[in-house]
Amino acid sequence: MVNRTISYERYPDIDDGSWYIEGAGFASNEGPGDDGEYDNEHMDIIRQKLLNYNYSDIEQVYDPSGTIAEGEVAINDGLSIINYTGHGSNGSWGNGCPMNNTNVNSLTNTGMWPWIWSVACVNGEFHIGTCFAETWLRAT
């Protein structure tokens, strides 16, 4: 993981770096939470801030219609950032794009690893096995 991270920083993708300005938001439609917003409303606010900051596209994969396949296509095409808001477990997201460890290990986005903000319970619960956050870090 250390060598991968160093390589990622030292040798950026200069041939097709369009994915550096693309991202995704995966969200539930539950709430209200922060500032009285539902998760998908909160994600729309984050999306607009990123678009105002020169991102070219921020995919919206939200409940009730978001699917794992929709999220996988976006990730495999290349994303620099993923924002997630919803339920989580040690091995998965529960909403929007409800991916699990197996889905992450099947991705084909080698070299285009996103920065992930996961606002969910226990995705990083590393002390009881390979958790969801750790799976993302180990994925090739």
Which residues does each PLM region occupy?
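Cysteine-dependent hydrolase recognition
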Residues: 1-140
